[in-house]
Amino acid sequence: MSTFSLKIIRVGITVLVVVLAVIAIFNVWAFYTESPWTRDAKFTADVVAIAPDVSGLLTEVPVKDNQLVQKGQILFVIDQPRYQQALAEAEADVAYYQTLAAEKQRESSRRHRLGIQALSQEEIDQASNVLQTVQHQLAKAIAVRDLARLDLERTTVRAPAEGWVTNLNVHAGEFINRGATAVALVKKDTFYILAYLEETKLEGVKPGYRAEITPLGSNRILHGTVDSISAGVTNSSSSADSKGLATIDNNLEWVRLAQRVPVKIHLDSEDQQYLYPAGTTATVVITGPNDRDPHQVSPMTKLMHRLREFG
């Protein structure tokens, strides 16, 4: 074989290798930049901020931090004697005005029976007015009693749902104010994923699509379903000045950063058992209308998926 032919073969092989490398790099780049996936995803759950509706000293805190509690279980109790005394006083007022109202009712009925032959119209009207006033006082006393009873009931704070008590920062003997958050309750079976996907990848994301979730530092793959895509995010490039005019940031036209949009993903019921704390990180891959079949994926694609999902 001549020297010229060898050169042609070498050049051809080199060109072929370069073309294959360019194609491979392009495919990898498209795989990483266009496919709907993100490492910026967070485990999230419904969290209830527990705060008392009355103020007072804490007498009991029978739960521990991070304890699983049932719906209706006592979380803490506020000192009750003051509220018991207020209820007793309100009940006494109700009893007094009930007796007084009955007495004024009899008096008014008696005067109406006697009529203007024995009494003046003014005396009859006066009895009716007194009865009406006492009835209003009775209604007010009943309202005060009901409020005192409600306050007494609210001294015992119970779990509104089944879940985990977390960030418990109160103890027996402390004074707690009405409305001050004492503990957070992470509701059980409410965990979901908020995946922050770039806007360039939203074309491949639709409600009902399946998703794979890989928690950071874990080999376990969880599954879920896309619930919804956020309807809007903050426009950081525009704001209003003191006169209400629009203020637009100066951006370079050739540098455009893709905005991230929250996508809510519901975990499958069988994956709710795996407890990953709310706020922890995960990698999310949107697989389309159906779950990804691991037997139909090439080894190279599996490797690329794993490198992408590795946290």
Curated annotation (Swiss-Prot):
Q: Tell me which family the UniProt entry assigns to this protein.
A: Belongs to the membrane fusion protein (MFP) (TC 8.A.1) family.
Q: What is this protein called?
A: p-hydroxybenzoic acid efflux pump subunit AaeA
Its ancestry begins with: Bacteria, Pseudomonadati, Pseudomonadota, Gammaproteobacteria, Enterobacterales
NCBIfam families (UniProt xref): PRK10559.1, RND_mfp
Function per UniProt: Forms an efflux pump with AaeB.
Task: Spell out where the chain crosses the membrane.
Answer: 11-31
Question: Has keyword Magnesium?
Answer: no
Q: Which GO terms describe its molecular function?
A: transmembrane transporter activity
Entry GO terms, CC: plasma membrane
Q: Which UniProt keywords apply?
A: Cell inner membrane, Cell membrane, Membrane, Transmembrane, Transmembrane helix, Transport
Q: Subcellular localization, per the record?
A: Cell inner membrane
Q: How does it sit in the membrane?
A: Single-pass membrane protein
